[in-house]
Structure formats: structure tokens, C-alpha cells
Amino acid sequence: MNIAIRNPVPIRREEGSLQVALDPADRIETAKVFAVYGKGGIGKSTTSSNLSVAFSKLGKRVLQIGCDPKHDSTFTLTKRLAPTVIDALESVNFHSEELRPEDFVVEGFNGVKCVEAGGPPAGTGCGGYVVGQTVKLLKEHHLLEDTDVVVFDVLGDVVCGGFASPLQHADRALIVTANDFDSIFAMNRIVAAIHSKSKNYGVRLGGVIANRSAKTDEIDRFNAAVGLRRLAHFPDLDVVRRSRLKKSTLFEMEPSPELKAVTDEYMQLAETLWAGADPCEAVPMKDRDLFEFLGFD
């Protein structure tokens, strides 16, 4: 019996960062890919889902991939908690060839395709591995060939090698933040992770999305200092809270002038990103420097 042995994937070390090179066969080459990061609870899933709808309203074929073990990224699109990739794989003892696309892909509002990667039980395994397996599974079933836009909605502000794995696939990383100390502090750490990964991967920072904030003065001041730009601003509105409780995207809510301003902003954001947002060559601050920089006495 002949046993085929694949050459190991090379490991690169850059400035103390141990990084596994992406197998060329796993690259997403047929779509524009965005990875959405931000502090935990900042509204990344809300932002990702409404951005996905905005892309779909531009006539684009959209796939949203939730990268959180809670698997709650896409429920406003699908109106339910979708089955996870890891659960689907476990059901067939990890024989992926036995799965059908409908076992792990759910079509949501306005035709947005939704996938929840899921993750290992708490305290075990690596979530980044699950993200990698999700992309491989999508490729095996040729589900990326008819896709124009992929949106990765990534867990919290975790920037370990595992949950930084969507950066291997992304063209642009987007950071969702609020106009407060904790959100901007988390954003700086994410900038540092992306700055490190961009040495080996093609990902670049696309910009910042201000969320749940009446003002953006601290965000804008930080952006100017490190080399970022604000792409959109979504204030803290009750209609957003109600849309989550209704398990709906903002585009499905009862029309109002306030809501129209928000959905118009999402449409403008989608148009900007589709046209090709120039990369931000941001350089993160050191933690202590940022501590002194933010806020006022």
C-alpha cells in the first residue's frame, strides 16, 4: 500500500510571532474577503449582518461566516441559531465528504448565505482550527466559486494565533469600536495583531467603524495618531436593540427617518468597501503610551 505524505506547511517567524503559512490550496481567490474585529460586545455581529445585507442589496452574492463558539453571528439573517460546522462534522465522524451543503449552510435574508463555524468546548481545542476547517469544507463543496463577498465575524478582541486565522484569508480587516477607553484600547491591540500578520499575509487594515456612539472625537483622534480612518458611524439607537430582539436585520424593521439614516450609512459603507478601500498603514501605540493619550484629566 502506498501512503502519500504531504510536505509540512512551513512555519515563519517574524519579530517573535510564530505564524503558519497558509496552504495556497486554501486561499479564497474568487471573492472580496473582510474580517470584522472589535472588543467583545461592541456589536460586530450586528454590524456584520447588516453589512452583509447591504452588499446583497448591491447585487452581490454574500457569505457570512460566524467565528464564535456561541454561533450567534447570523441569527438576525436566518431567524434561528444555525447548525455549526463543527457539529455537522461530528455528526459524520469528521468524514466531510458525507456532508451536503444544506447540512451547514443556511440561506438568510435577501439571499445572504450563512455559516457558523462554531468551536470546541470551552477550555479545549483551538477555534482557529475550526475556521480553517470551515474554509476547506466550503471549498470542497465549491461554495466559494459563486460568491462575491465573504464576511468573517470574529470572536471578541482575541488576537491569538487561532482567532487571527481569518486574517489569513481576508483582503481587509475592519475594526468596530465605540468612542470610549476600553473599545479603543482593544482596537489598538487588534491593530498590533494585524500589523504583525500583514508581514506574511495579504491582509491590510481597511478602516474603523464607529458603533454605539453619539460622538467620534476620541476615535478620530486615535485614528489620526496611528494612521487609521473612520469608514462609517452608527449611533446608539433603540431600533438596533429592538432588531436583535426581533431577530431581524435593520433592513427589515419598520421604516422611519432615523432607521433610513442608518441603513443608508450601511449602503454607503458597502459601496465604499466594494469599490476598494485603500489600505491603512497604521502603526499601533504601546499600551502605556495609549493610556496617557486617551481621555482627559
Curated annotation (Swiss-Prot):
Molecular function GO labels: 4 iron, 4 sulfur cluster binding; ATP binding; metal ion binding; oxidoreductase activity, acting on iron-sulfur proteins as donors; oxidoreductase activity, acting on the CH-CH group of donors, iron-sulfur protein as acceptor
Keywords on record: 4Fe-4S, ATP-binding, Bacteriochlorophyll biosynthesis, Chlorophyll biosynthesis, Iron, Iron-sulfur, Magnesium, Metal-binding, Nucleotide-binding, Oxidoreductase, Photosynthesis
Cofactor note: Binds 1 [4Fe-4S] cluster per dimer.
Keyword Oxidoreductase: yes
Residues binding [4Fe-4S] cluster: C126, C160
Functional pathway: Porphyrin-containing compound metabolism; bacteriochlorophyll biosynthesis (light-independent)
Keyword Oxidoreductase among record annotations: yes
CDD domains registered for this protein in UniProt: Bchl-like (cd02032)
Enzyme Commission number: 1.3.7.7
Binding residue positions for ATP: G41, I42, G43, K44, S45, T46, K70, N211, R212, P235, D236, L237
Catalytic activity: chlorophyllide a + oxidized 2[4Fe-4S]-[ferredoxin] + 2 ADP + 2 phosphate = protochlorophyllide a + reduced 2[4Fe-4S]-[ferredoxin] + 2 ATP + 2 H2O
Positions with a binding annotation for Mg(2+): S45
Stored InterPro entries: NifH/chlL_CS, NifH/frxC, P-loop_NTPase, Protochlorophyllide_ATP-bd
GO biological process: light-independent bacteriochlorophyll biosynthetic process; photosynthesis, dark reaction
Cofactors, names only: [4Fe-4S] cluster
Enzyme class: oxidoreductase
Source superkingdom: Bacteria
Record-stated family: Belongs to the NifH/BchL/ChlL family.
Role description: Component of the dark-operative protochlorophyllide reductase (DPOR) that uses Mg-ATP and reduced ferredoxin to reduce ring D of protochlorophyllide (Pchlide) to form chlorophyllide a (Chlide). This reaction is light-independent. The L component serves as a unique electron donor to the NB-component of the complex, and binds Mg-ATP.
Assembly: Homodimer. Protochlorophyllide reductase is composed of three subunits; BchL, BchN and BchB.
NCBIfam families reported for this sequence: DPOR_bchL (TIGR01281)
Protein name: Light-independent protochlorophyllide reductase iron-sulfur ATP-binding protein
Taxon lineage: Bacteria, Pseudomonadati, Pseudomonadota, Alphaproteobacteria, Hyphomicrobiales
